[in-house]
Structures are given as C-alpha cells and as structure tokens.
Amino acid sequence: MYSGRRCSGPIADLKLASLKRGLLISAWLLAAIVSGGGCGASLPSTDLPPSREVVAALEFPDLRDYRGIVDCRPSATGVDQLRLAELARAAQIDFICLADRVSKPTSNYGMPGFTSQVLFFPGGSFAADGGEILGIDLRDPIEPALEAPRLIEQIHRQGGVAIANHVDRFSSVSDYAAADGIAIFSLAQAWEAAGEWRIFLRALLLGPDRFFGALDVRPLEALRLYDGMARGTRVSMVAAMGAEKRLGVLGSTVGTFEQFMLISTTHLLAPERQPSPMLDALRRGHAYISFDFLGYVAQFAFYAVDGEHKTMMGDEAAFSPTLSLKVQLPSQADEIAIVAGGAPVARASNSDRLESLVKSPGVYRAEAYRGGHPWILSNPVYLR
C-alpha cells in the first residue's frame, strides 16, 4: 500500500528530470509563440533585386542566365497555372517545368508556352523502380506502369527530356542510365526526410532562414551516384522542388510555393528564353543550382580555359597540361571547391573566385558554401 510518503531513488529522480524537461520545453515553446520567433508564414530573406533583369552569362556573353524551377506539382494543392505564374513572377522565376504525378495515360501535362511572362514546360512525374522519372516537354500519353528504362524511351520518343529523381531509391543505376539528367537535390525529399514533427517544431522555434537552412544539406548519396554516372557519360545536374507541403503552424502555413520558390533554383544558360534553346541547355548541362536564400545568384561561371579557348559547364574538352579551371561567384563564399570523383582537388576560403591548373583528365565540377550549407553547385566540365 502507498504510504503517502515522497518516493526517492533513481525512478523518482527520472520522473522529476522528465517533468523538469517537459516544463522547460513548454516554457521554450510558449516563449517562441509569444515572441513570434518561428518562421510561420514568413518568407526567406532572399535578397531579390527590385525587378527581374536577365543578365548575360559570365564569360559567355552570347548566352543569358535564366533561373527557374524543375519539378513543380501544383495539382496536389489545387494551384492553377495562372496563380502559379503570379507566384513565380513575384519570386523572379523565368521558367517552370511542370511535373504532376501521372497515374494513368494522359495528354494533359499543363499548358505549354508563356503564362504571365513565365515560360512553362508541360510534363509529369512517373513512379518507377523505387525512384521517379520526370518527363519534361511532354505532349503524348505515356503508360505510367512502365519500368524506368521504357519510360525514358517513351519520353525521348516524343522529344522530351528525362530526369531521374530520388536516385538513391532506385534498385540499380541501370534503371536510369539513359536519363538526360539527375536531380541531385529534392526540396520535397529533404522535407520528408526531416519528418513532420521535426518540421513543425523547427517552424515554431526558428526564423525562416534557419528553418529552411536545415533542409539545405549536401546530398551525399545523390552526388556520389551522379559522379559515378558522369564518369562514363555526360549527364545534366538539376535541383527538384516537388509539391508544396502547406503545414499548419499555429494559424500560419509553412512549405508553400511562395516560400519554396525563394529557396533553390536551377539556372539554364541559353541564348533566348524559348522552348528549344532552353531544353537544349537542360540536356547539355549548361546549368547550375543555387540556394538563393543564402544569397541571390544572378550570375555564376565554372569553365575550363586553355589559351583563348573556353569550355563551359556541361561541355567536353581535350585534356592539356596548360589547361586551368576557373570559378567565378557573384559574391564571396565561405568555401569554394573544385571536385573530381567526389573529392576536392582545389579549395579557396572567403573568396569569390578560384583558379586551378588541371593535373589529369577527369570530370570536374564546382561547389560553393555559406554557413556550412551548399550555396552553388555547378554542372561538370568533362576533360577527356
């Protein structure tokens, strides 16, 4: 029988510690709520310029630097294309590749062309062999139950671009070996990996930049798979977005398109903003990824130079002992690295540029970091 006396010992101490911890967490949450410290419906502090001005690509003035979204899925939350275009214009987005999930054969992949001055590419996403295949610039129906190699074949048959997404979930690299590109980062996948409760608490307690920064983690496995594939063939690197999440946090909403469009973008370097040259840039890897909440990126260059000849991202050149690789950033990064085979071969700290002589043939790409998070990831230069 319980004597009415206060218990002591390890169990009582554990209960007391748990109670104190619970009270501390409750007080912390209450302070965050009262102070409005969480991100709520706040936007990341992406320092967009006053208006969108498309600029020439650094070192390649015949091309323009267009920023956009690959893998946008508006139907999941009922956002129509006109509203999506309005959100894109506010975020200074130049193009969007639509990718709603395809569950049955359809020719409704969204409206192609310009909507409110934003260029849309119709397309869809197909679940396949554990991962996903994104089809860009689609018109004709495709059977979604096909295996990944057949899906890629059907996308190519109608002139579309095939991107492998969630590559770490495929059972084999051979499933997506014929794809034009790989999405090495997926905002939706990063969200899912964090877990809804962790997302909720972060949104409650952290400001928007720290909250979204927690999702911006170097995608180690995807980069490993990408580097392995790029050793044997040229393949484009992009970032995927996915569907908006719209998580309710005390009357606010987190994970909206309005927020996501300010986090990361895929840049295409093309002579004009028309479907054909833009798709060509995507196929050829004339592209790079930027996480703009760490600093708006209007221009970036990674290229090889040998005398007067320059080779841009996505292109191939013959190796020469006089050849060097150059990185040019729009502003200073905490760290810049030139990477080959997943390992850095040259580094610079607190700089906006890096140059290095090349010692051997290989597949080289550039990475720039701020605050320990990826800021800019380039497509490779292939030196054979």
Predicted segments with their positions:
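Cationic, low-complexity basic patches in intrinsically disordered or flexible, solvent-exposed regions
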Residues: 16, 21
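Bacterial N-terminal signal peptides
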Residues: 25-34
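Hydrophobic alpha-helical membrane context
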Residues: 32-33, 83, 112, 254
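C-terminal motif of bacterial Sec signal peptides marking the signal peptidase cleavage site
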Residues: 37-38
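C-terminal functional module detector
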Residues: 41-65, 69, 77-81, 231-237, ...
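A metal-dependent hydrolase metal-coordination microenvironment
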Residues: 43-202, 206-207, 212, 216-224, ...
